[in-house]
Amino acid sequence: MNDISDYIQGELIKTPFNLYNLIAKYIESNKNTKVAFVGGYLRDLLISKFHKKSFSKPVDIDLVIEGSSISLAKFIKKNIVNVDLCLIKEFNLYNTVEININDYKIDIASARKEIYSSPGLNPTVTKSTIEEDLKRRDFTINSIAFEVSTRKIYDLYGGIADIKSKRLNLLHSNSISDDPSRLIRCAKYASRLDFNISNNSLKQSQETVRQWPWKSSETHQKMIYPPALGIRIRMELAEICKHDNLTNVISIIHKWEIISILNENIKVDKRFLRGLNWIKKLKGNHMLYLLKDSEDLEKACQRFLVNNSEIKILEDYSNVKKILKFNQKKFMHFSPSSWTEFIEDRNLNDETVKLLICDGGPYWRKLFKWLFIYKFIKSKKDGETLKKEGWDPGKEMGKEIKRLRYLEIDKLYRN
């Protein structure tokens, strides 16, 4: 283990802003205080060592302290040099602090113990030790810590062995029921790191999902889902969409037979996955794409705290999809201006149009052209010009401006 400890220390000393040495100085002036590096940064260092896999420079660094997280954060801010920006955000609920230094983020957590009273709810938190803090982690590969003062490696759950074996192991038998968003994270790691989920962890995941939805309370016989759970899943998906291959992650979730954690009505086939790629290219709302074909839209929206404007987008999508399906002969002969009128008279949101594009089918090119071309074309004559030509302001002038705009749209198409 000494060679691993030497390797980790050698890499941590290279962390930006002389962070490692700043922490060592803090420990010197605060005797008996333990500070450890934990989480993804440490995991990726070990993956690099054992599998020669290179990662981009770290932008997120996680620390855990047996003491005051804010005290360490203030010490770092006071003593750090040669930085343009250093901001501190406190989160009192979990005794955590986020430091933003230029483009880097350092999360400092006071060591804590978490108890989940009900699946998917936020936990009750009490102060604890580094060893106890590691018990609340999601996977063994993320439950490794390196204490700065003693150079001690904490590996209570065989995380290093799992990294060597490229294996994803949940930490304990209640890992998924405590926080079902860990399913999404697990698929993310499988995709990003090219790791495989262990049989026991897969079995736990499948059994827990079969019990979905988890009820937090009932009001007037109407199911209320734990709001924290929906938020966490949406946040995980947003991070994946930003930094990973969402299509690959969803394929893995489907392969593991746990897709109902997102939506039991999702049919994962080539068309669906192609649309998922498109929604990312269009910079659309991936959550709405995952929910768009829900049989019980109200329940699906409730599950993921979909707001009213997003619900309107989904309802419009569903209605327009039906109209297009049952009038195919009519729409096949629509001109660009007719498509423009069809979309704009219904006041369709761009996100609705993106969902329709991602469905593919015979009309996606027309909808695509409206989204990126036709909607931006204007009439060559505005209201002031028409007034000079003798038009009176009002409804008729508006109709004329619209007619002239439609002529420009169709002219562009012909040319």
Regions found by a protein language model. Name each.
Residues M1-N415:
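Catalytic cores of the polymerase beta-like nucleotidyltransferase superfamily
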